[in-house]
Amino acid sequence: MSKILVFGHQNPDSDAIGSSVAFAYLAKEAYGLDTEAVALGTPNEETAFVLNYFGVEAPRVITSAKAEGAEQVILTDHNEFQQSVSDIAEVEVYGVVDHHRVANFETASPLYMRLEPVGSASSIVYRMFKEHGVAVPKEIAGLMLSGLISDTLLLKSPTTHPTDKIIAPELAELAGVNLEEYGLAMLKAGTNLASKSAEELIDIDAKTFELNGNNVRVAQVNTVDIAEVLERQAEIEAAMQAANESNGYSDFVLMITDIVNSNSEILALGANMDKVEAAFNFKLENNHAFLAGAVSRKKQVVPQLTESFNA
């Protein structure tokens, strides 16, 4: 039997990397599975900081599961096929550990699925470590903590579940870090956008959603200065338009999130700007608008877009 590949979504963030590495380890220890954590893209700057801090080598990047000789895969931090490996429909999905909506997903065989409405996939994996009585190595605890911090913006996002607030201090202790100090340093490491090209910037953390027959690209970047990002608006818009044309996106929505003040600016281009405006009850001026209190794509952007596009 070939090795089972474990991976998060395309354009992996800290939770995609952390949950996949942690679950691959747990699957070996608890279930005796022959697993390998891989990635569907190179780590972003935040995740690179995490891996370096805990001395963990980045998972190797793959573009095809079958090309690796894999017959089975385990998905973490995602389930929608368009967010997964290119040939996901050609391999068996052995299992899924996720905290997102379930959409565009079907399998030919029964599978293991663990879905919980918590702040991160890493939160679920940590609970599974405890359920199976498997000791958590320091570096694995650090990766799971980082995934939780990243997805909940240090427990400030509305996606934060009461369970996450219990888990975070436990993981911080296991990882040997101060939760607040490490969390802030980690989040700030991911806000260095000046060195990124516009094409790189809009692809740092981007996912495609099928909304009533439209392929809508929703990306998010974290910053400490929204105005600084908007100084590059023309360049960013050109990259968004090119992405729409080359990938068949009907619309591109970019969240520029201020992690200090917990607000976002929405920059949007495409064929359905009326639906984008209706989703958030705002008016786009020069293609962008302020969205007070919005920091979560999963809870404060995608559901609203889904409702508007389906109206």
Curated annotation (Swiss-Prot):
Residues annotated to bind Mn(2+) 2: 15, 77, 99, 151
Listed transmembrane segments: none
Cofactor(s) the record lists: Mn(2+)
One function term, GO molecular function aspect: inorganic diphosphate phosphatase activity
Keywords, sorted A to Z: Cytoplasm, Hydrolase, Manganese, Metal-binding, Phosphoprotein
Similarity remark: Belongs to the PPase class C family.
Name of the protein in question: Probable manganese-dependent inorganic pyrophosphatase
Encoding gene (name): ppaC
